[in-house]
Amino acid sequence: MMYHIPGVLSPQDVARFREHLEQAEWVDGRVTTGAQGAQVKNNQQVDTRSALYAALQNEVLNAVNQHALFFAAALPRTLSTPLFNRYQNNETYGFHVDGAVRSHPQNGCMRTDLSATLFLSDPESYDGGELVVNDTFGQHRVKLPAGDLVLYPSSSLHCVTPVTRGVRVASFMWIQSMIRDDKKRAMLFELDNNIQSLKSHYGESEEILSLLNLYHNLLREWSEI
């Protein structure tokens, strides 16, 4: 399933990120890509050796960790170190699949269950640059407001279309979920959403407590910690 997570960064945070990123050192985006991806990748990424990068990636991690909807949809166990990319002058990233396992600075390695893109450019400021994701439900074309995030299975083929005007800047990362199976994770997310909706309409009740108990028992049964 694909999820739109709005308001991960406020407009003020986005403006500050953009100001800092204009001062950043950018390198060829292929430095973080395997052999297959390097053949179709043409973009730039912030140099991960800089102090500015270290500060910005930490802010992204803090923002997603504090976002309740992101947590409910992803049920994250491990988050990769966020990266930052930039597309301009017809730069693009052709169809590719993300690697199943990535190195992780604390855990040694992590499984990539979910991929996330946090948009940092207003959609009106550039042409093209759509994230295109192919999954079992068809093809999805994504171009979200700055500060919003899209979450989708890392197993999906995806691409970024050429940016023909302006500049598209984003942060991206991978998530190892406590729930490996996409369908089980989607069921838990739907159950959680319905529990929260019932609580907001009717307050606490024995029935809602029973549903909450069911949610946590399923999470206990399915989670990998």
Curated annotation (Swiss-Prot):
Signal peptide span: none
GO BP: any one term: intracellular iron ion homeostasis
Uppermost EC category: oxidoreductase
Taxonomic path: Bacteria, Pseudomonadati, Pseudomonadota, Gammaproteobacteria, Enterobacterales
PANTHER family for the chain: PKHD-TYPE HYDROXYLASE YBIX
Binding site for Fe cation: H96, D98, H158
Gene (UniProt): ybiX
Domain (Fe2OG dioxygenase) ranges: 78-177
The EC number(s) this enzyme carries: 1.14.11.-
Name of the protein in question: PKHD-type hydroxylase YbiX
